[in-house]
Structure formats: structure tokens, C-alpha cells
Amino acid sequence: MSKKCALTGRKPRRGYSYAIRGISKKKKGIGLKVTGRTKRRFFPNMMTKRLWSTEENRFLKLKISAAALRLVDKLGLDQVVARAKSKGF
């Protein structure tokens, strides 16, 4: 199953997970040192939702991110779907 948002196009990003040791300077230590880093992925907060479309007069079952859900609350589903279609998501 795809981990890409149907409305915003958000997808997993790549980054690093850092292994840290030492005592922080705030606690009067010498500071934190990075002893290693491993590759990891940051996933968007995805969920499957059934949303009512007034334009199509039916429910749409979409796999969307939490950010897209806030966008739907703000602008309305039909406007967000139109924007996604124009951008090609």
C-alpha cells in the first residue's frame, strides 16, 4: 500500500537517527557527542478516511495525511480535491 497522501502528495522522507552520549553543558558537562548515525525514514501521519463530497454527492474513501485532513477542515473537500487534481496527485 502506498505511503503517499492522495491530497497533498506528502510521502516518507529520509534522514538519520543519531546515537548520542555524554552530559549536556546545561548540566555542567562537557557536551553531547554524536557517536553514530544510522539511516531511517520519517513517515507522514497517514490514515484512511471516508469523506463526503457535496459535488459528487457521495463518500470518497481517501488515504490522506493529518495535514491534509486539517486542510479539508479549512477549505472544504471539493476545493482540496480540485487542487490535488490540478497538481497531479
Curated annotation (Swiss-Prot):
Fetch the InterPro entries from UniProt. Ribosomal_bL28, Ribosomal_bL28/bL31-like_sf, Ribosomal_bL28_bact-type, Ribosomal_bL28_sf
Name the HAMAP family for this protein: Ribosomal_bL28 (MF_00373)
**GO biological process per UniProt:** translation
| Signal peptide positions on this chain | none
Question: What would be the name of the gene that encodes this protein?
Answer: rpmB
The entry assigns this protein to a family as follows:
Belongs to the bacterial ribosomal protein bL28 family.
- GO molecular function of the protein, one example? structural constituent of ribosome
* Organism (species): Chlamydia trachomatis serovar D (strain ATCC VR-885 / DSM 19411 / UW-3/Cx)
What's this protein's name? Large ribosomal subunit protein bL28
- Gene3D superfamilies per record: Ribosomal protein L28/L24
- GO cellular component, as recorded: ribonucleoprotein complex; ribosome
| Keyword annotations of the record | Ribonucleoprotein, Ribosomal protein
